[in-house]
């Protein structure tokens, strides 16, 4: 395998000494190792299409060996996921991944098809997928974590579910040390910080609580927080930027520095454009698309929000205030999802924006492509977007 990955060839004499291993899963004329190297060089955007070829291809695309080869070849890339929760459905959320459509023929006369970006959301059949909440999902490496969720949202939970994005299977990880209500998760240095409300034994009141989950050791511990934070306003949302965990409590933000184990109240500027619940961190920069549908980024040096400017000749997406918007880090780019209603159905749109920092106080965005990627029934629903690395 190492020789194939490095591009070396095997001499005919060695081939005679060693019986060639025949693939029983794909092409009978090719060895398994060679097939793995070939598929590993293909962009992960085409994997949903390849999975339709046969059951053997689906098995190959889910094998850990394939992703080991991708890592050896330096072919690791981000894979964008969308989890859609439809409140009228009782079978759990639906999962989709961004992929490329099959190549269109050059003889196509469909003008609308010719203008298409070529991207689409493909549904992933994931059996027994647990329910999710707005802020219960976090991606670390090739895994997506779903934390503190129950079938009934008004109940507390300490559950930790892990989705292996290689095989698209769920497994249950060790539970948190405490049960939490209304969780919000954020990632910093391969660790997941879980903020939520906790009810102490023998008490009727709920207090803020923070638990850190080490994704490498799968060990979680509670973080000691000041009384003013635990008994103050409820932690609505959280994020991680500037090497700190940022907790929005009421109309103020409290920062936790895990290196120093210290807490600091930093005012209310950061949370000004976070209450729309439409924000994400890309390249250690916090981006937001608030209810006014203006794209902004947070300057941690001077603690102020700045507008995301567009490159000359370009234009950022214009979104309706009524649209449900979700942002995600897509390999260092900003992925934007929003919906538009059309009759009994609605279209889910996606735009990918490349980001370029010109100086300390200016970031420019360039829309690489924008297109509708999915049709779903027009029913009450919400969706989360996030990306794993495979």
From Swiss-Prot:
Keyword vocabulary terms for this entry: Kelch repeat, Repeat
Residue ranges of Kelch repeats: 143-190, 237-284, 286-330
SMART domains, per the entry: FBOX
Pfam families per record: F-box (PF00646), Kelch_FKB95 (PF25210)
Top-rank taxon, per record: Eukaryota
Region (Disordered): 1-27
Membrane-crossing segments per the record: none
UniProt key word ATP-binding: no
SUPFAM superfamilies given in the database record: F-box domain, Kelch motif
PANTHER family: F-BOX/KELCH-REPEAT PROTEIN SKIP4 (PTHR24414), GALACTOSE OXIDASE_KELCH REPEAT SUPERFAMILY PROTEIN (PTHR24414:SF184)
Name of the protein in its database record: F-box/kelch-repeat protein At4g25710
Originating organism: Arabidopsis thaliana (Mouse-ear cress)
């Amino acid at each position: 395998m190492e020789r194939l990955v490095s591009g070396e060839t095997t001499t005919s004499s060695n081939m005679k000494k060693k019986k060639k291993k025949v693939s029983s899963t794909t092409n009978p004329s090719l060895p398994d190792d060679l097939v793995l190297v070939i598929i590993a060089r293909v962009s992960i955007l085409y994997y949903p299409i390849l999975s339709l070829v046969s059951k053997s291809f689906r098995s190959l695309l889910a094998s850990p060996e394939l992703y080991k080869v991708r890592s050896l070849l330096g072919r690791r890339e981000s894979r964008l996921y969308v989890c859609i929760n439809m409140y009228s459905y009782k079978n759990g959320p639906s999962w989709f991944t961004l992929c490329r459509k099959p190549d269109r023929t050059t003889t196509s006369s469909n003008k609308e098809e010719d203008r298409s970006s070529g991207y689409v959301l493909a549904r992933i059949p994931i059996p027994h997928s647990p329910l999710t909440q707005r802020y219960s999902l976090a991606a670390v490496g090739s895994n997506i974590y779903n934390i503190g969720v129950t079938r009934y949202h008004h109940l507390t939970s300490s559950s930790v579910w892990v989705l292996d994005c290689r095989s698209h299977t769920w497994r249950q990880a060790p539970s948190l040390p405490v049960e939490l209500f209304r969780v919000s998760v954020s990632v910093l240095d391969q660790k997941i910080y879980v903020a939520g409300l906790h009810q102490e034994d023998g008490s009727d009141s709920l207090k803020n609580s923070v638990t850190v989950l080490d994704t490498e050791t799968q060990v979680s511990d509670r973080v000691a927080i000041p009384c003013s934070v635990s008994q103050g306003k409820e932690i609505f949302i959280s994020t991680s930027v500037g090497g700190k965990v940022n907790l929005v409590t009421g109309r103020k933000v409290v920062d936790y520095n895990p290196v120093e184990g210290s807490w600091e109240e930093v005012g209310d500027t950061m949370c000004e454009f976070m209450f729309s619940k439409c924000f994400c961190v890309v390249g250690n920069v916090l981006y937001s698309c608030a209810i006014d549908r203006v794209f902004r980024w947070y300057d941690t040096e001077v603690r102020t929000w700045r507008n995301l400017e567009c490159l000359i000749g370009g234009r950022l997406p214009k979104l309706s205030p009524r649209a449900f918007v979700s942002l995600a880090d897509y390999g260092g780019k900003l992925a934007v999802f929003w919906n538009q209603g059309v009759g009994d159905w609605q279209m889910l749109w996606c735009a990918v924006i490349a980001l370029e920092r010109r100086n300390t106080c200016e970031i420019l965005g360039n829309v690489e492509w924008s297109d509708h990627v999915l049709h779903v029934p027009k029913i009450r629903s919400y969706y989360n977007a996030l990306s794993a690395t495979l």
